């Protein structure tokens, strides 16, 4: 017989998992209608939380941990805000940690969160799954990976399919006449760094563009490496005419050095960033981006963690990405025809 979980109760009651969790935990921040519907669903499904979940509730801290890769990264700042608000609505406070893209700092924060006996942890993991990441598994602490994963670990996750957005970006630049596209990659110690680099390599090959390895600079998802990457790429004997930065902070670094060098973005050189930060659209010129919903990612991560805390085994979720064309990837050459893309 298939075990009934809180996700089933929420679906039958027509409420979110967070609302069902609040009702079942006795949180007063619920409406009479929601309480009635959840109670009816519990009765109809004969829902009985498993022993592990009951034990967790009897000693719970009403807190969760969130460990992000770099709090300076606008993407992770937005993610933290969404997670904090969604968790609070479900009756949990969020303890935030910053790994600063360093494994030893990641381990220190995870050890601290474990010692604080949080009810579950959402983490954007770095590394190969050793150290404190492994401790989460051996101690059976409810865990959800967000944005990134670790190869070989069966942890529920919510991530982004980078393939479509990167393919659209390369096609857009190729259609505009660019044949040498510089790529500022994320670190290969992260799943996103590896996946996005692989997607870029496939897209370049499919478009028949130059696969010169010198056109790739491996950064570390921090602004300084974005600046260093642009500087290195522009020193090539045949420099690129377009750039694709694999995340928002490296894009910020790229913008800074291009301004310093007097290179006009959108006129002298095209630039596209992975991640759509709100103020990217306000720049002059507005920045073309590969967009994916950080708000949806955060909400889903919290819902998944609540299911794991309840003893459930949610399926991992992969969100889509898409190119948003703005002025930063305009070009003086006449673009070839291609599929229509979202503009904003």
What are these regions (language model features)?
Residues 1-62, 330-333, 339-344:
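N-terminal helix-turn-helix DNA-binding module of bacterial transcription factors
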Residues 17-21, 56-72, 172, 180-187:
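Short beta-strand segments enriched in small/hydrophobic residues
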Residues 47-112, 116-120, 198-201, 205:
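Amphipathic helical "hinge" segments at domain boundaries
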């Amino acid at each position: 017989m298939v075990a009934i979980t809180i996700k089933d109760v929420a679906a039958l009651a027509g409420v979110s998992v967070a609302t069902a969790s609040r009702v079942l935990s006795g949180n007063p921040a619920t409406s009479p209608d929601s309480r009635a519907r959840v109670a009816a669903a519990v009765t109809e499904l004969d829902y009985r939380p498993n022993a592990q979940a009951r034990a967790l509730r009897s000693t719970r801290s009403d807190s969760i941990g969130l460990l992000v890769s770099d709090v300076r990264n606008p993407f992770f700042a937005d993610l933290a805000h969404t997670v904090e608000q969604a968790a609070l609505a479900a009756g949990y406070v969020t303890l935030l940690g910053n790994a600063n893209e360093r494994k030893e700092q990641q381990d220190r924060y995870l050890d601290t969160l474990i010692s604080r006996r949080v009810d579950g942890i959402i983490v954007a993991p770095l590394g190969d799954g050793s150290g404190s990441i492994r401790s989460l598994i051996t101690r059976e602490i409810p865990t959800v990976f967000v944005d990134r994963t670790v190869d070989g670990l069966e942890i529920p996750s919510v991530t982004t399919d980078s393939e479509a957005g990167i393919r659209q970006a390369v096609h857009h630049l190729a259609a505009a006449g660019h044949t040498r596209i510089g790529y500022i990659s994320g670190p290969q110690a992260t799943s996103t760094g590896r996946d996005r680099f692989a997607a870029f390599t496939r897209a370049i090959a499919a478009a028949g563009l130059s696969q010169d390895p010198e056109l790739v600079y491996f950064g570390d998802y921090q602004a300084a490496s974005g600046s260093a990457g642009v500087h290195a790429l522009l020193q090539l004997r045949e420099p690129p005419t377009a750039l694709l930065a694999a995340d928002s902070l490296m894009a910020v670094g790229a913008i800074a050095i291009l301004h310093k060098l007097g290179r006009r973005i959108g006129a002298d050189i095209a630039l596209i960033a992975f991640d759509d930060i709100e103020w990217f659209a306000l720049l002059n010129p507005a920045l073309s981006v590969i967009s994916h919903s950080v708000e949806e990612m955060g909400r889903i991560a919290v819902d998944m963690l609540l299911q794991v805390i309840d003893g459930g085994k949610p399926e991992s979720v992969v969100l889509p990405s898409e190119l948003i064309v703005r002025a930063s990837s305009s070009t003086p050459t006449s673009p070839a025809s291609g599929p229509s893309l979202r503009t904003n």
